[in-house]
Amino acid sequence: MKLNRIKLVLVEKEVSQTELAKKLGKSFSTINAYCSNRKQPSLELLNEIADILSVIMKDLIVDK
């Protein structure tokens, strides 16, 4: 079951997982785990990701 859409939004925004990891100060493997839905980010981190990608948090968790 997919719980987040981070990977899809990264593709839409043409931002790599490596770029996002650097901007968040996280490792690539952590971001990759979020993108693969192996781990879920906290709401606080999800909000940071939304800010970086210029989307609302809802766009990261549900289909439009």
Task: Name what the model sees in each region.
Residues 1-15:
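A short, Lys/Arg-rich alpha-helix, primarily the initiator
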Residues 10, 35, 53:
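DNA major-groove recognition helix of helix-turn-helix
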Residues 12, 23, 52:
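Residues within the alpha-helical elements of helix-turn-helix
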Residues 19, 30, 59:
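Residues in the helix-turn-helix
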Residues 20-21, 49:
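Short alpha-helical "recognition helix" segments of helix-turn-helix
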Residues 25-40:
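Recognition helix of helix-turn-helix/homeodomain-like DNA-binding domains
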Residues 44-59:
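DNA major-groove recognition helix of helix-turn-helix/homeodomain DNA-binding modules
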